[in-house]
Amino acid sequence: MSGYPPTSQGYGYGYGGGNQPPPPQPPYSSGGNNPPYGSSTTSSPYAVPYGASKPQSSSSSAPTYGSSSYGAPPPSAPYAPSPGDYNKPPKEKPYGGGYGAPPPSGSSDYGSYGAGPRPSQPSGHGGGYGATPPHGVSDYGSYGGAPPRPASSGHGGGYGGYPPQASYGSPFASLIPSGFAPGTDPNIVACFQAADQDGSGFIDDKELQGALSSYQQRFSMRTVHLLMYLFTNSNAMKIGPKEFTALFYSLQNWRSIFERSDKDRSGRIDVNELRDALLSLGFSVSPVVLDLLVSKFDKSGGKNRAIEYDNFIECCLTVKGLTEKFKEKDTAYSGSATFNYESFMLTVLPFLIA
């Protein structure tokens, strides 16, 4: 199913009359024998089976939150000089001082609040999510991973493909102009061109909201902002043809998953159906997290204990975005990651203030 005109059955979305198959590589779904991100594998201790308690890990390579006092240096990660002191020899002075006070020479790479990361710090992607992880671990369903690029597309990955999920980088980075690749679904091109009334090659948040509404995909402005943030990796509040195509196909895939999970055809999915939907996307989350998601995205304030399609999309965007950011730091696929204060704030705030 690609596009959203009415079909002959189901929810009535899909421009091919319901008989046209979805894209050959639907985005953000668990494929083949790849276990969902967060599920148990025989070769990786990344997570325990669904609902089971997590065993004690014998590895101490990544300290867990709460294992030491806030601000204390991790045992295996000595602090590097702050950005302004890279060329100065560190002084023998312990990390400390009042929160927000100027850091001493030789302070950690946490540095003072607002300080940037070390310029020589590697991204920690290990080939990017979608590459084969170490120790034979699967790519967790390739959720967020970049598929193979089509040959000679000339568009940095090609339309119909999905952008590599690298580090978000600067949240205020500008978008690179792009165009539609040959063979792009004409409905997608027409939808974008109708929204791009000024012919700038970009559409803003209100234009995107209107374009999706024309295909009976009505979303709140908060959901639209989350879509733009995750598909552009920036807060530019505009989206080009390349990102719009990936977004369009992803929404198509997520609607298909919602329809399959809504077994009673109520137009809402409960906590068990949400669990199945997230597993289809490649995520195995705990019962506590599932209950929290349903409570958060239930329009009735938790009375129905179920979420509708538009809030399901926002739920998927939240789980997808936070998991990708966590995986950037979890380079060893250990289930643990270390964030400095600024990284943590930049990770969480876009989902709180979208």
From Swiss-Prot:
Gene3D superfamilies: EF-hand. The keyword Cytoplasm does not apply. SMART domains: EFh. Keywords: Calcium, Metal-binding, Repeat. Residues 72-81 have a biased composition (Pro residues). Ca(2+) 1 binds at D196, D198, S200, E207. GO terms for molecular function: calcium ion binding. Pfam families: EF-hand_5, EF-hand_7. Residues 183-218, 249-284 form the EF-hand domain. Disulfide bonds: none annotated. InterPro entries: CML48/49/50 (IPR044590), EF-hand-dom_pair (IPR011992), EF_Hand_1_Ca_BS (IPR018247), EF_hand_dom (IPR002048). Residues 1-159 are annotated as: Disordered. Residues 1-10, 28-71, 106-117 have a biased composition (Low complexity). Ca(2+) 2 binds at D262, D264, S266, R268, E273. Potential calcium sensor. This is Probable calcium-binding protein CML50. It comes from Arabidopsis thaliana.
